[in-house]
Amino acid sequence: MPAATRALGASILICLSAASLPAAPPELLISAATNLRNACERLETEFEVSTGIPVLFNFGSTGKLAAQIEQGAPVDLLVAADAATPRHLESLGLTLPGSLTTYARGRLALWWRAGSSLDFGSLEELARPEVKRFAIADPRLAPYGLAAVQALQAAGIWEQVQPRMVYAENVLQALQYAETGNVEAALVARSLCVEGQGRWVLIPAGWHEPLDQALVLISGGPRTREAQRFAAFLLGAEGQRILQSFGYETPGAVP
């Protein structure tokens, strides 16, 4: 075979091999719990302006996001609604050692539509007979759903209201059920209430386990350096200020 032909064949082989390799995604891919949906819009804007790094968020319940990571999803960073799930991924060897950090503490709230004929002054009022249905996030997948169950039990109305509960896949879907009138109210994250059009009442923090929320870098993620920069931004002064504006308590403010 002529040398020129061999060289051309080698070039084609190299090109085909390169084409078969999976390309790194152009954006930093962050899996984030849905309670962060509103806050992340502002976080994304500020981070991209300050760093020039594009971000793509994948929202879902913390349990579902963790399952995706366990199945090999090319995620760079998990920003969870609890600390237990990141610790679980850490125990499986799926995270960057030493990267698990608490970034905020969330609060649970009862939300209902502003135009509703119903009004709530406390969680116990969900037991009133005129409340036909209300929504919570699936407690098997969503930390805010588990907190809702704990709060209903602490309020002494669990047995009474359990038949009226509608389970949503995540806390954002629970809110959407209430917004669209499919249910009269929903137990959701305060962070989803503060800029909305509805009405809401805060649930006593002592009625459920603390909603300490942690982040962790995923080992083998295609954009680890960029993920480290986002984590530093979220834990820094500007990121913490944004979280506080959405009703989160930040580590320095948590007693």
Language model segments and positions:
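Bacterial N-terminal signal peptides that target proteins for export
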Residues: 1-9
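Bacterial N-terminal signal peptides
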Residues: 9-19
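Exported/periplasmic ABC-transporter solute-binding proteins
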Residues: 23-52, 56-73, 80-83, 87-96, ...
